């Protein structure tokens, strides 16, 4: 029995179309239009959401601006209390939200539930961390700088930016919405959420949990619609004071149009896995399979290219192939390891990379197999730098192996990429691992583990085309605030008294 849009969530559904949320109410768009969300498994329309107009975006922004002023004056402990309540409601209603993730983005059922629970934990932790971070200020006295007496005291604290525009990606529409919503709200900001089309209904259910928690009217909005209609309008809106975006190269275009608005962006990666001769090959093979093929490789932090020393390449490829043969391929409802990729266009793009590699002589460790959006796991050996898949991000269950003859060769390939999100190194020599880590031009390097985002309080950032700024709970709270200073001027130096 379907759980989405029923029970406490019934009010977010208008017939067959999910409403959008603005000014504390669930609304039907005046456009009279809707956007279809196609189930990646059935390739049929699963849900519909409102196609909001630019005027409706304007009204949401106006309401956010008004609500934010009052919210910023709300005591910090009260903000935290409402966030804790929202987190509890979110976890209580994990089943219908997880159902949406299964049907919208083909996320395996067990992983869908885990994402919702993780999102609730993230929001609670954010509330706790926010009380600590924002509850502290800084005092600086003037005589610490040469030539000054102690006649000035500078008190600095963090204040909200205003209205945060949050744009999460399809692959983690709940968790990466929570990672933006929580920090924005605890810091005293208002928030306008523009969810991805695939994942929009899960996001709407999530927003309703915040509605049920009792956040002030207008503080949170969730607008849905076509990017061609409201995408640029949102990102260039004069009412936006901060943009937090996770996704692909659309973010580069946003950054060029954003002007003076602070940006937090994670835009993908080509995460390299460098394997040295002394590595634990069982550990390596397990992490290559987990890192490269979890959620069908549709993760920014997935292993995207394996750079392995020639002397151990055959052994590692053999171990990886044995593990790939055991993966369950099928629909997400069956908790399959490999599920359909999110859209037909994504599957076509992946196939294009595979065919290019085939034409240029890559070794296919498995037969290439595709049914609709479902692509079976494929390891490509003897990949060369002239193949597209050596550089482009497939975002699917296809992984290239490049054989190298030196550590320097592996580092060079990693650093030649226009991406720089994460990378990983497998070796028993910690000294060598640190040296390689320092040489890799990535935001994070994992030693003896596959790339990963999290735990959610860890710093998470990319270099080059992989992003701007840093995420993680503490970093996000700091990014969504600005420093306000008050200087107390004394008529005479304070240490003359007493």
Swiss-Prot record:
Its EC number is 1.2.1.9. GO terms for molecular function: glyceraldehyde-3-phosphate dehydrogenase (NADP+) (non-phosphorylating) activity; lactaldehyde dehydrogenase (NAD+) activity. InterPro entries: Ald_DH/histidinol_DH, Ald_DH_C, Ald_DH_CS_CYS, Ald_DH_CS_GLU, Ald_DH_N, Aldehyde_DH_dom, ALDH-related_metabolic_enz. Transmembrane segments: none annotated. GO terms for cellular component: cytoplasm. Keywords: Cytoplasm, NADP, Oxidoreductase. The record marks 171 as: Transition state stabilizer. NADP(+) binds at residues 194, 197, 232, 393. The keyword Acyltransferase does not apply. It is an enzyme of class 1 (oxidoreductase). NAD(+) binds at residues 247-251. The keyword NADP applies. The active site is at residues 266, 300. Substrate binds at residues 118, 171-172, 299-301, 453. It catalyses: D-glyceraldehyde 3-phosphate + NADP(+) + H2O = (2R)-3-phosphoglycerate + NADPH + 2 H(+). It is found in: Cytoplasm. Pfam families: Aldedh (PF00171). Important as a means of generating NADPH for biosynthetic reactions. PANTHER family: ALDEHYDE DEHYDROGENASE. Belongs to the aldehyde dehydrogenase family. This is NADP-dependent glyceraldehyde-3-phosphate dehydrogenase. The lineage of its organism: Eukaryota, Viridiplantae, Streptophyta, Embryophyta, Tracheophyta.
């Amino acid at each position: 029995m379907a759980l989405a849009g029923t029970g406490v969530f019934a009010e977010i559904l208008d017939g067959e179309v999910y409403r959008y949320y603005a000014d504390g109410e669930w609304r039907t768009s005046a456009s009279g239009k809707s956007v279809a969300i196609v189930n990646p498994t059935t390739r049929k329309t699963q849900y519909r959401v409102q196609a909001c107009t630019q005027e409706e975006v304007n009204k949401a922004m106006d309401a956010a601006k008004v609500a934010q002023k009052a919210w910023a004056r709300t005591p910090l402990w009260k903000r935290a209390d409402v966030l804790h309540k929202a987190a509890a409601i979110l976890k209580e209603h994990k089943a219908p939200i997880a159902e949406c993730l299964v049907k919208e983005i083909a996320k395996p059922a067990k992983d869908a539930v885990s994402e919702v629970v993780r999102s609730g934990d993230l929001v609670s932790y954010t509330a706790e961390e926010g009380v600590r971070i924002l509850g502290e200020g800084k005092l600086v006295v003037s005589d610490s700088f040469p030539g000054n007496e102690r006649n000035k005291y500078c008190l600095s604290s963090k204040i909200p930016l205003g209205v945060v525009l949050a744009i999460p990606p399809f692959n983690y529409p709940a968790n990466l919405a929570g990672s933006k919503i929580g920090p924005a709200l605890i810091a005293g900001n208002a928030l306008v959420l523009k969810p991805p089309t695939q994942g929009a209904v899960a996001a709407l259910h999530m927003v309703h949990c915040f509605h049920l928690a009792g956040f002030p009217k207008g503080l949170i909005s969730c607008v849905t619609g076509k990017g061609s209609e409201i995408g640029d309008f949102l990102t260039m809106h004069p009412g936006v004071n901060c943009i937090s975006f996770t996704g692909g190269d659309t973010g580069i275009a946003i950054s060029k149009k954003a002007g003076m608005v602070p940006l937090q962006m994670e835009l993908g990666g080509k995460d390299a896995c460098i394997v040295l001769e002394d590595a634990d090959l069982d550990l390596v093979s397990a992490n290559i399979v987990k890192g490269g093929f979890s959620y069908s490789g549709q993760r920014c932090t997935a292993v995207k290219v394996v750079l392995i020393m020639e002397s151990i390449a055959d052994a590692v490829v053999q171990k990886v192939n044995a593990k790939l043969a055991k993966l369950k391929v099928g629909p997400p409802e069956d908790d399959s390891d490999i599920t359909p990729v999110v859209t037909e266009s994504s599957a076509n793009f992946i196939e294009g990379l595979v065919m290019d590699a085939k034409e240029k002589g890559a070794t296919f460790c498995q037969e290439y197999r595709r049914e609709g959006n479902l692509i079976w796991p494929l390891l490509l050996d003897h990949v060369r730098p002239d193949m597209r898949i050596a550089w482009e991000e497939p975002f699917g269950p296809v992984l290239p192996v490049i054989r190298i003859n030196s550590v320097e060769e592996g580092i060079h390939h990693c650093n030649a990429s226009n991406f720089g999100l994460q990378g990983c190194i497998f070796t028993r020599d910690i000294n060598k691992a640190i040296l390689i880590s320092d040489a890799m031009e990535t935001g994070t390097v994992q030693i003896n583990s596959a790339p990963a985002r999290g735990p959610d309080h860890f710093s998470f950032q990319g270099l080059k085309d992989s992003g701007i700024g840093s995420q993680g709970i503490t970093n996000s709270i700091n990014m969504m605030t600005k420093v306000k200073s008050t200087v107390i001027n004394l008529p005479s130096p304070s240490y003359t008294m007493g």
